[in-house]
């Protein structure tokens, strides 16, 4: 069963999802809700929806992957949740089944989750009192993993599960989570070949055959990914620092810079 999230769902995508028996749409805005109602009515179907709320909680992660603060593009401001849920209940072709929340990615603390889930629990009670049948809670994901310091200890799945049970377990809802990164974040390796070693005026470059189109996170927001040589260098060899870059004709096509002072590779 598929849950359809995202702030920019198109009419065509909605039609395909409804035709395929989608589990639910996580609706992000009133215009999206109105379009989905129109599409569902035209197809003679009822679209199951959760409505994503924005709790204005700082996930304490990189700003580029924060999704639950008021300045972020995601969800309905929680202060307007009752109004929007009432609007959804009046639209034909929609069946409101729950609440969706997602505050960010690569979270390394449980506290932000706790704050957001407490708000979800309270909102669930309020919406039920308003007559809405809230049976599902999509709590998002974002549980962090270790990228750099092997001594880092992000929350474990067991600790996260205990928090979920504590904050929303008493509500009797179906719980949906999106573990994503925690499952697959360390499952892949990008292997690239050094094409050229280049000396600039104030730095050295290792130019790879891999680029930001293969792994965009470092170029996009400075994400850290460990870089190791496929073949270990010989002992007692001179080392220098290098910028590890790709061949794309943009200066942002960089995997690591001299700010990663541990990144030393052998001279040729």
Where are these regions (language model features)?
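Acidic, glycine-rich loop-and-beta core segments that form the ion-binding/anion-interacting portion
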Residues: 116-172
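A short, hydrophobic C-terminal helix/tail in secreted or cell-surface proteins
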Residues: 264-268
């Amino acid at each position: 069963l598929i849950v359809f999230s995202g702030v920019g769902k198109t009419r065509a995508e909605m039609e395909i999802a409804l035709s395929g028996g989608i589990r639910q749409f996580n609706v992000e805005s009133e215009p999206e809700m109105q379009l989905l109602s129109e599409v569902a009515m035209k197809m003679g179907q009822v679209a199951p929806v959760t409505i994503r709320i924005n709790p204005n909680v700082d996930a304490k992660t990189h700003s580029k992957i924060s999704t639950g603060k008021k300045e972020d593009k995601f969800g309905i401001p929680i202060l307007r949740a009752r109004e929007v849920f009432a609007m959804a209940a009046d639209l034909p072709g929609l069946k409101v089944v729950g609440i969706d929340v997602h505050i960010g990615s690569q979270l390394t603390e449980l506290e932000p989750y706790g704050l957001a889930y407490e708000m979800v629990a309270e909102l669930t009670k309020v919406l039920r009192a308003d007559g809405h049948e809230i049976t599902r809670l999509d709590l998002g994901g974002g549980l962090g993993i270790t990228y750099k310091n092997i001594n880092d200890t992000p929350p474990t799945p067991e600790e996260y599960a205990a928090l979920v049970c504590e904050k929303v377990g008493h509500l009797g809802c179906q719980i949906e989570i999106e573990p994503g990164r925690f499952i697959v974040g360390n499952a892949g390796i990008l292997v690239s070949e050094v094409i050229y070693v280049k000396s600039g005026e104030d730095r050295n470059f290792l130019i790879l055959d891999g680029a930001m189109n293969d792994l965009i996170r470092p170029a996009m927001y400075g994400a850290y990914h460990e870089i190791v040589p496929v073949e270990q260098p010989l002992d007692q060899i001179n080392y220098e620092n290098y910028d590890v870059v790709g061949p794309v004709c943009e200066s942002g096509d960089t995997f690591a810079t001299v700010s990663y002072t541990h990144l030393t590779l052998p001279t040729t």
